[in-house]
């Protein structure tokens, strides 16, 4: 249930064009994800980019010279700032589109899935450490995805 008094700051940067994935769609679906996670008064940055740019970022920050679907960069708390800084989620739209076709989702569904995944990483969830942590993260991701898919 969305709280009308909720005040989040959602910054959207689209480096690639998509008629289907608009800034409004990204902002609205991010707000719903934050609401599902009971997060209020947070700031988050969402960037849609291409495979080449995400490859560069992946190489620089993770040492992996290849494109990927989503990257997350958590922020440190800033004392005295109006919002709790969650961090940045970067999604490769071409990668997401190819992945959606491969697994049988619409592009909007795949972007939703990647946003949930990225935001969970910002909150400290991890699926690469051990199977137990992976199960916790993916169960929550699936729960939020399943609930919000019908609202697309």
Curated annotation (Swiss-Prot):
GO CC aspect terms: cytoplasm
Coiled-coil segments on the chain, per record: none
GO BP, sorted A to Z: rRNA processing
UniProt protein name: Endoribonuclease YbeY
Function: Single strand-specific metallo-endoribonuclease involved in late-stage 70S ribosome quality control and in maturation of the 3' terminus of the 16S rRNA.
Highest taxon listed in the record's lineage: Bacteria
Record text on cofactor binding: Binds 1 zinc ion.
Organism the protein comes from: Sulfurihydrogenibium sp. (strain YO3AOP1)
Keywords, ordered alphabetically: Cytoplasm, Endonuclease, Hydrolase, Metal-binding, Nuclease, Ribosome biogenesis, rRNA processing, Zinc
Family: Belongs to the endoribonuclease YbeY family.
Record-listed E.C. numbers: 3.1.-.-
SUPFAM superfamilies: Metalloproteases ('zincins'), catalytic domain (SSF55486)
Record: residues binding Zn(2+): 117, 121, 127
Key word Manganese present: no
Cofactors, names only: Zn(2+)
Gene: ybeY
Top-rank EC class of the record's enzyme: hydrolase
Compartments it resides in: Cytoplasm
Keyword rRNA processing appears in the UniProt entry: yes
NCBIfam families, sorted: rRNA maturation RNase YbeY
Main localisation: cytoplasm
Molecular function terms from GO: metalloendopeptidase activity; RNA endonuclease activity; zinc ion binding
